[in-house]
Amino acid sequence: MRSSAASDVYKRQGYTYDGVVVPQIQYLGSNAVALRDDGFTIYSGRQIPKELKTVQVEQEIISTFYDEDNIGLVFKNDSKDKQYTMQVYSSAGKLKFSKDFNIPYTTIRMSDDYIVMYNSSQLCVLNSNGSEKYFGSVDGTVKDFFKLGWNKYLLVMDTGVNVIKLS
């Protein structure tokens, strides 16, 4: 059982966001990012985290992805030509780019400063500025994608492995 004084300290150290769901918290270097249903909040500090930046969005977030330097959000797009909109932010919360796209992905993630999207038959790789570096069909299910060397990546699939050179 907590004492009244301990309970007061506990209440003052936390953050309360009414009507907001925070399904995921990730540590990016020395900061923590709370991925919220309406955006994200960046915190700094280990003992008593300090709120550094909050980014709120109006659209419903359907996917998130991140690495130590980037935080990405994906929304449904109302356009008939492009199904989705991607927004990528720096780890300081500054918008780097926004991009509409039409790849029916099942997985989206960051890998060595690239954004990797894939489904059972397609793979798309974007750089951290949103420029497309690779798009193609694949035979098999993508299991992993990681860097081998300068612009060379290993695509691991259920049917085998392929080396891809990005342009």
Where are each of the predicted segments found?
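Repeated scaffold domains used in trafficking and secretory/extracellular systems
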Residues: 18-30, 57-68, 101-112, 140-150
